[in-house]
């Protein structure tokens, strides 16, 4: 079932229940099917926690592989001297920054809330080209939409434009 679940990203727990019953004549609960799907994704892609831990490394790889790209993180130090925790992450791709030179001289900014396991806000800066097409410029993951996080984001957008 591991391969089937991976092949069908939108494989719903109710379909897992049906397929287990058809294949093995065994009934499982919805909760068990949900946990099985989560476990398969963790085995293949890692945990949510590991993804957040790897974010600074992934951003570094983006900057190294994409000329003109930029990234920054804000990590809050731990009180006990251990590793801190990621509070904010910013990135912009070099190609998008260069494309902004050909956009209308207006920068549109917006934020939207994350509603999954980890809360927070995604802040975005976009431009509009002469064909009225949206050009993404920069993104940031922040703790919430407040004056301090907006200032942090816009300061980085200004530096990297």
Report the location of each language-model feature:
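DNA-binding interface regions
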Residues: 1-161
């Amino acid at each position: 079932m591991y391969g089937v679940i991976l092949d069908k990203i939108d494989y719903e727990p109710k379909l897992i229940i049906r397929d287990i019953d058809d294949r093995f004549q065994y009934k499982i609960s919805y909760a068990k099917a949900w946990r099985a799907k989560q476990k398969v994704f963790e085995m293949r892609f890692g945990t949510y926690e590991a993804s957040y831990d790897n974010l600074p490394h992934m951003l570094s790889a983006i900057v190294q592989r994409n000329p003109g790209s930029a990234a920054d993180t804000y990590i809050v130090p731990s009180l006990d001297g251990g590793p801190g925790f990621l509070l904010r992450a910013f990135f912009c791709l070099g190609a998008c920054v260069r494309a902004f030179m050909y956009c209308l001289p207006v920068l549109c900014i917006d934020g939207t809330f994350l509603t999954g396991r980890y809360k927070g806000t995604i802040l975005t800066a976009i431009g509009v080209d002469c064909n009225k097409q949206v050009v993404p410029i920069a993104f940031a993951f922040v703790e919430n939409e407040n004056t301090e996080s907006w200032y942090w984001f816009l300061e980085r957008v200004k530096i990297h434009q």
